[in-house]
Amino acid sequence: EEVEEAEEEPKEPPIYYSLEDPFIVNLSTDTRRFLQLTIELMARDQGVIDAVKEHRPRLRNNLLLLFSAETPESISTAEGKEALRRAALAEVQSVLGDLGEPAEVEELYFTSLVMQ
């Protein structure tokens, strides 16, 4: 009796795209605190990257709104930062999907993060 191994298709190499200008937002707090983030996205299809480029203003808008709703306490831990990263990735995928674009952005990375 032969057991067939499921062959996975080799994945395309990753394509990284920077959302360029840092995101700088005031945090939701009584004091004057801000968050600065630099973001890179990863996909394996140039069509996805092209959709990100085309809709960059809308993506930046939605991400700015998401980030400005955070409090210093909510992102002071590694778990909080990871939750924010996952929420940002879901927002990018949602925006692209709502626009009927390919939404297969696989990862979102914070390449810099400063909170003051």
Name every feature range the model reports, one short phrase each.
Residues 1-116:
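Flexible, low-complexity charged segments
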